[in-house]
Amino acid sequence: NIAWRDQGQVANLRQSIIKQKKLEYHMRLHENWELFSDALQAASQSVEDGGLDIKSIFIEKDYWISRSLSLMAAKDKDNRAIFKGGTSLTKAYGIGSRFSEDIDIAISEAWTLSGNQLKMLIKRTAKSMTEGLQEMDMPGFTSKGSHYHKAYYSYPRAIDTLQVGAIKAGQLLVEINSFANPYPFQKCKLQSFLTEFLQKTGNENLIKEYDMQPFEVNVLDRRRTLTEKLVSLLRCSLADN
């Protein structure tokens, strides 16, 4: 009986470890490269053909942006990392149809942390967000300090298109700063275009298998973001040419 109970405890522990590891996975469709590539192409088709009518370069970039945000939210136990900027308006609030390659993050209540604590928090946040990505060597652009982090990261491309307009394939810009308190903010449910496509086509099994479920992220209130955008436009209009 003792041996049986010990074996049962071992089995339970093993299942617990597997479950914990499972919870650490976030958006793994790219691990099945052929399926990932096929999904990108299918999702880019017209609505009449069952797709989303969005260019594959945007769908792919959105996948990696969404994955970075999902990873960030999972590790942000103290609710310090707040998603903001123009990309947040589109992804969280459905305002506009802007496609971007930047992920703008602000650290809330930074003044409650020591300089070293803040520096380590920004470093950890950047590391969490960019898991599986490669930092790009861009002298003169990359900027890191105790209050900020700004760098480009590359992701593996599954499509041939290199650029559409100002959007370049294969790269993301991650910006994290603690200069302004991001308030008010709220929890918003986000999902990738690919998740939307899989839902639309009845592929819930793939969403579950590859951890493509919607997730929650702290997002700066849209009124604050829109106000900041308006102020920025006014400053630009008043500036000397």
Regions found by a protein language model. Name each.
Residues 13, 20-26, 52, 66-70, ...:
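Catalytic cores of NTP-dependent nucleotidyl/adenyl transfer enzymes across multiple folds
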Residues 68-77, 124-132:
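Generic non-transmembrane alpha-helical segments
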Residues 29-45, 95-106, 200-202:
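Short, compositionally biased low-complexity segments
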Residues 44-47, 107-111, 234:
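Short, histidine-centered active-site or binding-site loop motifs used for metal coordination
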Residues 73-103, 107-109:
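Active-site nucleotide-donor binding segment shared across nucleotidyl transfer reactions
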Residues 4-6, 10-67, 116:
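N-terminal regions immediately upstream of nucleotidyltransferase
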Residues 107-144:
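Metal-dependent nucleotidyltransferase catalytic core
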Residues 92-96, 115-120, 185-187:
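Short, conserved acidic/polar surface loops in the N-terminal third of protein domains
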